Amino acid sequence: VLVTPGKVPDSYILDSEALLREKGWIYLKGSKKEMREGTDGFTYRYAEGPVTFPDALNRASRTVVTGEGGSSPSRFKHVVKFKPTKGQVGRLGLTDAKCDEVRSKLNLGKTQWLRRLTPVELERLNGFPDNHTELATDGRRAFFMGNALVCGVVSRIANEL
């Protein structure tokens, strides 16, 4: 399903600031037990368990949802670890102290980093041919894949009917 690292646009590679900030990737993917306040002033205890982060490549994938597109941190977007190219490391500064902090928190190797899935990878994950949605923007492509039925499942149902 995954494309080679050199084919991953820089915009899909996560930056350390987005990972470490107060409501960033690490916070959103993690477990929470906290007090929250509703718009009417009512306070309540909010709790949720962690989401595997980064996504495990040796297990079945989570469902692609319509909010998969865009670069903003989200609990629901797929994030995978990968080995960036030397060019990506240099352009994005993936060797600074904040990147080392992220690697330490997430048990990443020295040459590993994190990225979101590209539109082609989302298409592959859902069983569509590469570039099935290429005429749309990347955000719309992700939305389409989040709104799609997995082709293999539909094909099997059709064959049984």
Question: For each of these PLM feature ranges, what is it?
Answer:
Residues 1-161:
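C-terminal target-recognition/interaction regions appended to catalytic cores
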